[in-house]
Amino acid sequence: MALWGGRFSQESSALFKLFNDSLPVDYRLVEQDIVGSIAWAAAITQVGILSQDECEKLQQALKELLSEVEGNPELILASGAEDIHSFVEQSLIAKVGDLGKKLHTGRSRNDQVATDLKLWCKKEGQQQLVLLAKLREALLALAERELDAVMPGYTHLQRAQPVAFGHWCLAYVEMFERDISRLEDALKRADTCPLGTGALAGTAYPMDRYKLAESLGFASPTLNSLDTVSDRDHVVEICSDASISMMHLSRMAEDLIFFNSGEAGFIDLDDEVTSGSSLMPQKKNPDALELIRGKTGRVYGSLIGILTTMKALPLAYNKDMQEDKEGLFDVMDSWSICLEMAALVLSGLKVNRENTLKAAQQGYANSTELADYLVAKGMPFREAHHVVGEVVVHAISEQKPLEDFALEQLQSFASIIEQDVYDCLTIESCLAKREALGGTALPQVQSALAAKKVKK
């Protein structure tokens, strides 16, 4: 029976029930709904709705129900209940009879689902933080293994300047650390308890909402009942944080897909994260990375979905808000599997150092060093930039690197060039000069890695 049937003289149509019921989605909140109900039983006992004996019977029955449904979603889904709240209440009544009908006193499904969802977000958010930390550790381990491998750095997907592979790894460590910080902030804002605010105007029973919040592990109760039952900022924020993190995952995946390509050949991926072709027997496809890149779009879609759902809703609760969960659940599922898969890919990744070094030595990646050399000799940078551009054009026409030019040839472009120019054109020199904080000089990369390893 529906929880709201007394007002109606006709049964809902089968189509409406199919359209309206949310159990196929919100069954995932069963643990939170039961935990919240256990806390609510204690709260209404303190204001005289239940006796202590009744409270204990209800709480025991709820704990039994939680044990029965853990790992058994089929039991919930087969019930035909409208939503997870209905399932829990109907199951409770089946266990303790009419006593179960007292539990909802002073409570609305509006504050109930808001509480369930925040509890779920807090729990799942902590699990995401663990996965982000594991990915960070995988990047640090890779940076340590391949710290001094030299590779070309890119702008516009054109070879630009040489960088250490460890520097590339630490760039993504920075990104994922920001993801951790963002999610931690979001979880702090979600750490307020909605329970006890009723449908929209607050509960009529003088309960201690601070104590209720504490019993559920929240930092504090919410302070405005209208806002409380209308608020889904935590859903939006977590989906937004996930979207930013997925952007970082997708960018890393794209880098690695390119590095793994036949055209680059910079890295090899383990067989366990790749697949083959049904037609072409030679293929080894980076499917794990491509799926990370692909799943990013669906996470973005869920963020846009919840923003669009919420953008014009009047206070307080509206049924539109039932649509908040499917996207959120999919976001968290997609994000978590992508974090796990990315860490697995990194753990088995091997750098082909000969190929990365050869690529770094091509494409005139030492051109900036020649310009800096001219500046050190007294030439204004803008003039030096122009001179080196002319040198590069000539080098391309002769199909040889800058360091292979005879001194006389280089002096034909700038007479201040001397024999010591060749010292600055080596890959080693290119790296070593980037010794300012945040640069790719190996001592800087080693220092940055050491600092990251200390920071947990």
Swiss-Prot record:
Pathways involved: Amino-acid biosynthesis; L-arginine biosynthesis; L-arginine from L-ornithine and carbamoyl phosphate: step 3/3
UniProt cross-references to Pfam families, sorted A to Z: ASL_C2 (PF14698), Lyase_1 (PF00206)
Cellular component GO terms, alphabetical: cytosol
Swiss-Prot/TrEMBL catalytic activity: 2-(N(omega)-L-arginino)succinate = fumarate + L-arginine
Top-level class of the enzyme under EC nomenclature: lyase
Protein name: Argininosuccinate lyase
Family label: Belongs to the lyase 1 family. Argininosuccinate lyase subfamily.
Main localization, broad class: cytoplasm
Keywords (A to Z) from UniProt: Amino-acid biosynthesis, Arginine biosynthesis, Cytoplasm, Lyase
SUPFAM superfamilies: L-aspartase-like
